[in-house]
Amino acid sequence: MSVSYEDVVNAYALIQNHIINTESYYSNVLSEILGSKIIVKYENKQHTGSFKVRGALNKLLSLSKAEKQNGIIAMSAGNHSQGVAYSAKILGIKSTIVMPDNTPFDKIRKTSDLGADVIIHGETLNDAEKHVDSLVKKNNFTKIHPFNDKFIIAGQGTMALEFIEDHPDIDTLLVPVGGGGLIAGCSLIAKHLNKKIEVIGVETELFPSLYNVYNNTNFICGGSTLAEGIAVSNIGKIPLSIIKKNVKEVLKVSENSIEEAVSIFLLKDKVVSEGAGAAGLAAILENKDKFKNRNVGIFLCGGNIDSRVLSSILMRDLVRKGQIITLSIAMADKPGQLGAISKLCAEERVNILGVEHSRFALDLSVSSARLEITLETRNNEHAKNIIKKIELLGFSVIVKNTK
């Protein structure tokens, strides 16, 4: 079951009145950091915060009257659930979404708020899909697959249709890869509009399913990833047939790079990205020479990230930059020791965030104490300077939170 350029154009005609033609523009700040001309499609500003509504709408609009009346069902741990629920709501179709146990609560709540009946079932997406299949048989629902469906693929491809028509100078397109629906649709459009565009897939190193196909490797898929939206172990058969014709290569990126990319989007470009949405930027971070002086198009394809996770990313970024450090300081157990360090911190304009003073750890001598202190500094250089000055006071210092 193939997908054509005309399928994507027809999909756009169907859904364009229901979606946002999200903004895309050259990012000066990202380009200066990375040495490439970076053009970003900000699909995090789409309805439900991701591109998934495009494919979902196109699929639901293709259903027969009877299928719509019987209701639809989908499995998802991420944005597909919200895309389907939103589309069903505006089209007046009853929806049921099955989500695995590890789905972030924020996504469960948002899906429920959109009117879907949410069922939590199984540890993995495969477990959820098995339950979906049983409910399809029981209730005669229509299953809305997240990527292995020609209507879904055509809908996702409309994002590239907008992007490349707005920026015909793009010569490289980086696309996050989960099950393959997005990159199948986008690569199809890219190659139709400009055969010279290089389309490159990007996966987290924990789920390199398409990378394995392209490189004849057998890396195991699994693990806890920040990019749960692309944590898929197997590429769909329908998208894979399209991908092989249009995608040049696939890159896998580390979790650290994805985390850094999310942080850069927020702190430098002033936008919120989820892990999967930052995969393209992460690929450039790891391959600056490869993309130097190219006109690189990237999709910030989703901005649905748990606030606690985002907070943790920002705090960890401060640790990497040396702006927050935790020191373990050995000292004699006598009056004035803590005061000396507090005085030094005040003189050096260092903020004390937390203090723990221990006398009873068995690895200490009876006349010793240990101070664990968390400090806020200006940068790595400032942090190194305060450590040196503490040591000059006669204390032994160990830095606890390092890169």
Give a label for each model feature:
Residues 1-403:
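PLP-dependent amino-acid enzyme catalytic core
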